[in-house]
Regions:
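Short loop/turn segments immediately following beta-strands, especially the blade-tip
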Residues: 94-99, 146-152, 193-200, 250-256, ...
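Beta-rich, blade/repeat-based domains predominating
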Residues: 110-120, 163-174, 210-232, 266-281, ...
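A short beta-strand motif characteristic of beta-propeller blades
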Residues: 103-108, 156-160, 213-217, 260-265, ...
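N-terminal secretory signal peptides
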Residues: 1-16, 30-34, 38, 42
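Short glycine/acidic-enriched loop and turn motifs that connect beta-strands
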Residues: 75-79, 131-135, 185-187, 243-244, ...
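N-terminal export leaders
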Residues: 16-28
């Protein structure tokens, strides 16, 4: 059942005009919310230094614009109200065009910078802060930064409430005038208008999700975890870990409202976290955090309809011992390979549970074939990104940023020996 209602939230998390749509999402039982990432640390076995020179890759070498990487770091537990954040929450790095090595050029304070998104012009960077006590209230927050086109450095513009607790993900609409945010503990997807100068207005509308799932620890309520535009820019996929659903929304740019178009239910207890579309907009890949699988669906980008399930593949070998947990899913620029991250949460024993996992993509069907669990220099990877040329993969680990060479023929990853040691990295995004 859906109904529109005015919001009765506090001034801290809303604006004077707000549209609210509540969606029933069925199911569930159990006891309490979010599980914080453990501070697990484990020694990586030393391995011989491989030959990882860019010459091993067939990517042509040509003059390129300056390239930069942006990383966000954990500064405190996400739900620890009143904790003092660390000094540095975001770092900017230059990328060496020959070696892919990262050199820090700027560090800024930011409170638990969890995920990033560029506007379409890449002149602005938007950041969600995965917290639950913004300005003494009970919401997360969103920050806006201007990007210097020559130096890559950031200038803070402003910060707004995310309109819900524990902001987890965000996307900018193709026109660059709206920011869509998923609030993990807020049970909602929200919209913030973007001004001409890149700064953010307060939340103007939200979609609230009702429901739960069968996992008694992680699915007692809705947990929106991702918002991702399809390649045509017409529709937004919203993954909700708590209710085992992926919703498709259309953004009405005149009213700034999200309108539901379709939805699909994953396997009970799967916990959909993030999604990825193929370039043609005909396939939708969903990485499921709680059962460590990837599910592939047909997708119609003209109507925003999710079609039949084509494949479900495990990201870990069986038998598996320990807690299963996936995080990120990204398709390589070539369209030939897909990667996901497995996070080795506390108590895991199967080594492949802590890895960047590589697959080939069947160009006819979209189906995945597992080719590698890359475990060298990998420790609880929340996120990863490719450099702008698709030569390197940078993994956001609990102990720093590791650099891996991508074999352009096979998709296999090789650790380069470069590890930028940092506090726990939540996210990395590249530009250039």
């Amino acid at each position: 059942m859906t109904n529109n209602r005015p919001s009765n939230r506090s001034e801290n998390g809303t604006v004077d005009r707000r549209f609210v749509l509540r969606l029933a999402a069925g199911g569930g039982v159990a006891a309490a919310g979010i599980v914080a990432s453990s501070n697990l640390s484990r020694a990586q076995e030393a391995s011989p230094e491989p030959d990882v020179t860019p010459a091993a890759s067939p990517v042509p070498v040509e003059a390129v614009a300056p390239q930069f990487a942006y990383a966000g770091f954990a500064s405190r537990p996400a739900i620890e109200a009143g904790a003092d954040p660390a000094t540095t929450g975001i770092s900017v790095y230059s990328i060496d065009p020959d070696t892919g090595a990262l050199t820090e050029i700027q560090a800024l304070g930011s409170d638990n910078a969890f995920f990033f998104a560029f506007d379409p012009s890449e002149r602005f960077l938007y950041v969600v802060n995965v917290i639950a006590d913004y300005e003494g209230g009970d919401t997360g927050s969103v920050e806006a930064y201007a990007i210097d086109g020559d130096t890559g450095m950031l200038t803070f513009l402003n910060r707004q409430s995310s309109g819900g607790a524990v902001a987890a993900h965000l996307s900018v609409d193709p026109g660059g005038r709206h920011l869509v945010v998923a609030n993990y503990n807020g049970m909602n997807f929200v919209v913030l208008p973007i001004n001409e100068d890149g700064s953010l207005e307060p939340v103007i509308s939200e979609v609230v999700i009702d429901g739960s799932g069968p996992n008694p620890d992680r699915q007692t309520m809705s947990h929106p975890h991702a918002v991702t535009y399809d390649p045509a820019g017409n529709f937004i996929a919203g993954a909700d870990l708590g209710v085992d659903k992926v919703f498709i929304f259309r953004l009405n740019t005149e009213t700034s409202e999200l309108e539901q178009v379709s939805e699909v239910s994953t396997a009970p207890g799967a916990g959909p976290r993030h999604v990825a579309f193929n370039e043609e907009g005909t396939l939708l890949y969903v990485v499921n955090e709680l059962n460590a699988t990837i599910t592939l669906y047909a997708y119609d980008s003209a109507t925003g309809t999710i079609g039949e399930e084509i494949q479900t593949i495990s990201t870990v070998p069986e038998p598996y011992v320990g807690t299963k947990s996936t995080a990120e899913i990204v398709i390589h620029q070539s369209g030939n390979f897909l990667y996901n991250s497995n996070r080795g949460l506390e108590g895991f024993e199967t080594p492949e549970g802590d890895a960047i996992v590589a697959y080939t993509i069947d160009q006819e069907t979209g189906e995945l074939t597992l080719i590698q669990h890359q475990m060298d220099a990998i420790e609880m990877p929340e996120n990863f990104a490719f450099d702008p040329t698709g030569t390197w993969l940078y993994a956001a680990n609990a102990n720093g940023i590791s650099q891996h060479l991508i074999d352009q023929e096979t998709g296999m990853l090789t650790f380069t020996g470069n590890l930028v040691e940092t506090p726990k990295v939540f996210v990395i995004l590249t530009r250039g």
